[in-house]
Amino acid sequence: PCIVFVQGSAWLKQNINSKLGVLSRLAEKGYVIAVVEYRHSGIAPFPAQAIDTRNAIRFMKIHADEYKADATKMFVAGDSSGGHSAFFSQLIKEDSNENIYPEADANVKGIISMYGALSIMFEDGMPSTLNHHQPDSPEGMEMGGVDLRNNPDLCRKMSVECNINEDTPLPPILMFHGTKDRTVNPKISVVVYKLLKKY
């Protein structure tokens, strides 16, 4: 099996080596690990990161034999903002203008979200100690440097729970989120989990 992993970075330029210690343990168990380097928010706004993740999945499917991966057992995973990109790689279905590997699809067998920054529908404040809505926030920059407090439609566009309904085709999902997270509000994962259970 292959895990296409999206390194969290607040959608800024990634340090794609920062989780190699953890990922190497999965590799020791027989997983092929592919780490995605996406266009960061300083280059391209949402949904570029999710589209780049989709193209990475397609690349691994096409080159599965070369990397000794099973193209029928692909998973997408990510931590923090990478969890957001992993989720949206499966929520976005139309990316033909930026699909650079049309001979393969971007569907996976499962999504793994580790403390994913899945929503910006929550107000700033505890337990998160960060700014999530102002133009210079990671989320504001991800949407092109806008003040998200005045753009609820953009907040909905970028929030997982606002893009899921009973007809949304999603693979099985595994979510992790610590209750003492001070960067990404753990209530976000709870809301998404409850919505997924509902549907």
Where do the model's predicted regions map?
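Alpha/beta-hydrolase superfamily serine-hydrolase fold, recognizing
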Residues: 1-199
